[in-house]
């Protein structure tokens, strides 16, 4: 009888320890995810400011191995590809400003998270040029959270 009580006590203690560990990981994961969300919001807040100035440092918001996967175009990868994307959008696309709205951020905040959202882009006269949705895979790097894979699609019907 003593052995079975001892065994039950050990099982109960192991279970309590397991639950406590799981809760600790959940709390830590939430803190990491919140950290990622704050970094993403900060990056999003300055993206179009840099773009509006045609500032090449916009590439620093992206991981060195980032890819922008625009619709109907090959992926543009690396900082050189990201720079080309923004240069072309500014010089030939007529885009002068934009706005993003984050709908959700998914993940545990440890290495990668995914941002889901909506975008709008405007010309120099503040006329809406395009609007759509996006998914961005963010990567935690030694320099903080960086845009790693950026994919978007227009809500407008292609002509």
Where is each model-derived feature located?
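Hydrophobic pocket/interface hotspot
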Residues: 47, 58-59, 66, 78, ...
